[in-house]
Amino acid sequence: MVTTLDNALLNDILQQVRPLIGQGKVADYIPALAEVPANKLGIAVCTLDGQIFQAGDADERFSIQSISKVLSLTLALSRYSEQDIWQRVGKEPSGQPFNSLVQLELEKGKPRNPFINLGALVVCDMLQSRLSAPKQRLLEVVRQLVKDDSISYDPRVARSEFEHSDRNAAIAYLMKSFGNFDNDVLTVLQTYFHYCAMRMSCVELARCFVYLANQGRSISGSESLITPMQARQINALMITSGMYDGAGEFAFRVGMPGKSGVGGGIIAIVPDEFCIAVWSPELDHAGNSLAGTAALERLAQQMGRSIF
């Protein structure tokens, strides 16, 4: 029996997964993230016409981290030809940790996909080349999508990440040695870490990313960020590469394109219907929200939704 989407359903799902809190681990390699209370839990759904359903801590903002990689790729697709992007970044799953250097060396500086650190750094490098103020431009895009000018970066998180950026800097310099990085490394790292340090709530994330369920168009339908084909391509990349080394498990359990961040957020797309955003800071072994993934799995089951 397929269940109707409403706030009561979302509340019920959160109660089902709340016992999982305590079984994961909050990201601690970024000190500012380690301070987030582990018991936070929220979910929100935004339909194509802008209707919002929500439960739990869905209005509380948190660091979106790698979810921002979808936004930076979207922005790059509006500024570059697809050929220009995909000759510098691949479309394949990595099978390696998100910040691994080994594969990059073997494959001569071309990252496997835009949703690992390596690929996202190349995308940020491309944005740095085309935009006079890439940090401000991404903020403007998000504020316009969400219709909220108070969305901002957390300077403390950005600074904390920059202070622990040796590995990402090494990645960028290695790509530079292969001719796949054009701008000053530290400047691009500042942009990249600010993107990761954007703060949004589940409600805001669901509103923001509904364009991926709406063939590249914003909620009103009046503005196309990307083409319908590009929206499908981003969704395809999220299925194969959006959940670090847990993409196969997520596709198996949830059956939706998804992108996670180590802040505990996940977005998931049901094409032509809605976008879901969940948040629970404790992560599983792959770096994905443990309770958040379980909540999406239950929602998919109870509503009978899957792209497969």
From Swiss-Prot:
Gene Ontology molecular function terms on file: glutaminase activity
Superkingdom of this protein's organism: Bacteria
Binding site for substrate: 66, 117, 161, 168, 192, 244, 262
Keyword Electron transport listed: no
E.C. number: 3.5.1.2
Reaction equations catalysed: L-glutamine + H2O = L-glutamate + NH4(+)
Keywords for this protein: Hydrolase
Quaternary structure and partners: Homotetramer.
Protein name: Glutaminase 1
